[in-house]
Design a protein with these regions (language model features):
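Ligand-binding clefts of soluble mixed alpha/beta catalytic domains
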Residues: 1-383
Length: 383
C-alpha cells in the first residue's frame, strides 16, 4: 500500500507475495501483479534481499506455465522493476514510473514504451487494471489449457493491399478484438493479440527492413505465443534484414535468433506473404505449417534490382539509359522469377489467394491446424 510507509516491501510482505506465486503454480492460474511501491524496506538488510530472490525465482519458474501480467500503477523501483519486467505483458498507467537503479533518467511510462519495456500504456491505473482483465479473459489459464473461444464477428473493413499494418490486422481479425503490444516501438514490426473466428491468436506484421529491435520484438512475441499454444499468424512485407549500426555480423546474429524462434515454435504457424519477402526474411518467416501468398507478392533470394545485376547483366550492356532499363528489368524479374507462382513451384508457398479472401482462408486454416501435435528431441532448451 503506497499510503503506508511508501509501500515499502518487508520480508513478511515478500513471503506473502511468494505464497501467491506458489498458489498460481498449484492451481494453474494466471498471475497479475500490481506495482505501486517505492521499493524494499532496506532496514531489514540481507533478509529482504533473500526474500526478493525467492520471488524472482518463483516468477522465473512460473514463466511459460501461466500467463504473468504486470500492472505498473504507480512507482516501480529497483528489484520491483526487475520483477515487473519478467512478466509476459507489462501494462503501465500514463502517470506511473519504472526504473531499476537510477531515478535521474526518464522513468516515465512514455519512456518505457519507447524503450519497448511497457507493452501497453493506459490513461490511468483503473484503465491499466481493466486492460489486465481483458488480457486474462483472452489468454489460456495455463500452458495445458486452451484459450477461451467466443463468437467472432467479421470486421466491416475490407482487406486492401496498401493498408497500414495495424489496419490490415484489424480488417482480418474479429471486430474489436485486436490488442496491439509495444505500439510505437520498432515500427518495422507490429504485434498484437486478437481473435480470428472466435479463437485467440498472436498476429505479427513484419514490414520494411527488419532490424535488431523489430527482430527481437517478434522473436519474444512468438516465444510467448508458443508457450501458451496460441497460433501465430504472420504477415510478411520485408525487403530484407538491415545491418544494425553498420555491424553486419550483429545483424546476422539477431536474424538467426528470429529464425530460431519460428523454428522452435510448435504451435500452429501460418505465414501470409502480402508484399516482399527477400533473402533470409523469406526463410525465417517461411518456417510455418501453411504459407499463403497474395498474387502481387515478391519472394526472392535477392532484391529484384540486385538480381538483375547478377542474372540479367547482359541485357544492360549498350543500353542508352541503363538506370531506366534496370528498373524495368527489376519489375519484370519481380513479376516472373520472384512471383509467388514460382515460389509455389519450389514448394515455398502452399496457396495463392485473393487478398479479399484472407480472413476466410485463415479461419479454415486455423481450424485445420487446431489439433497439431509436435514431438521434440529431448533437451532442456535451445542454447
Amino acid at each position: 500500500d503506497i499510503t503506508t510507509m511508501g509501500g515499502a516491501v518487508s520480508r513478511a510482505h515478500a513471503e506473502k507475495i511468494a505464497k501467491v506465486y506458489d498458489l498460481a503454480v498449484k492451481n494453474g492460474a494466471p498471475l497479475v501483479a500490481i506495482y505501486d511501491s517505492n521499493g524494499a524496506k532496506l532496514s531489514e538488510g540481507p533478509e529482504i534481499l533473500a526474500s526478493y530472490g525467492r520471488i524472482l525465482a518463483a516468477a522465473s519458474n512460473l514463466s511459460g506455465v501461466v500467463p504473468q501480467i504486470a500492472v505498473v500503477a504507480g512507482s516501480c523501483v529497483g528489484i520491483s522493476a526487475m520483477m515487473a519486467c519478467s512478466a509476459d505483458v507489462v501494462v503501465m498507467a500514463e502517470d506511473a514510473s519504472l526504473y531499476f537503479a537510477d531515478a535521474e533518467g526518464d522513468s516515465s511510462a512514455a519512456a518505457a514504451k519507447e524503450a519497448g519495456v511497457a507493452d501497453i500504456v493506459c490513461g490511468d491505473a483503473a484503465a491499466a487494471v481493466a486492460t489486465a482483465r481483458e488480457l486474462v479473459s483472452i489468454l489460456p489459464l495455463n500452458n495445458l489449457s486452451v484459450a477461451p473461444v467466443c463468437e467472432g464477428a467479421a470486421s466491416l473493413a475490407a482487406v486492401e493491399p496498401a493498408m497500414a499494418p495495424i489496419d490490415l490486422i484489424k480488417a482480418v481479425c474479429d471486430a474489436d478484438t485486436v490488442l496491439e503490444l509495444k505500439a510505437g516501438y520498432a515500427d518495422a514490426a507490429c504485434i498484437a493479440l486478437a481473435s480470428i473466428g472466435g479463437g485467440t491468436v498472436g498476429v505479427v506484421y513484419a514490414c520494411g527492413r527488419a532490424g535488431r529491435k523489430s527482430n527481437e520484438k517478434i522473436a519474444d512475441f512468438v516465444r510467448f505465443c508458443d508457450s501458451f499454444n496460441l497460433p501465430v499468424v504472420t504477415f510478411v512485407n520485408v525487403e530484407g534484414f538491415c545491418t544494425c549500426g553498420g555491424i553486419k555480423t550483429e545483424s546476422a546474429k539477431i536474424s538467426a535468433k528470429l529464425a530460431r524462434a519460428y523454428a522452435d515454435a510448435t504451435t500452429a504457424k501460418i505465414t501470409v506473404y502480402v508484399g516482399s519477402a527477400i533473402g533470409g526474411a523469406a526463410i525465417a518467416f517461411g518456417n510455418a505449417d501453411l504459407r499463403i501468398a497474395w498474387p502481387g507478392a515478391v519472394i526472392s533470394a535477392l532484391e529484384p534490382l540486385t538480381a538483375v545485376e547478377f542474372f540479367w547483366h547482359d541485357k544492360l550492356k549498350g543500353a542508352e539509359d541503363a538506370a531506366k532499363l534496370r528498373e524495368q528489368l527489376a519489375e519484370e524479374y519481380a513479376e516472373t522469377e520472384a512471383s509467388p507462382y514460382e515460389a509455389a513451384k519450389a514448394s515455398m508457398v502452399e496457396e495463392i489467394i485473393d487478398p479479399a479472401n484472407t480472413r476466410s482462408v485463415l479461419i479454415s486454416a486455423l481450424e485445420m491446424l487446431a489439433s497439431k501435435r509436435v514431438s521434440r528431441l529431448p533437451k532442456k532448451h535451445t542454447s
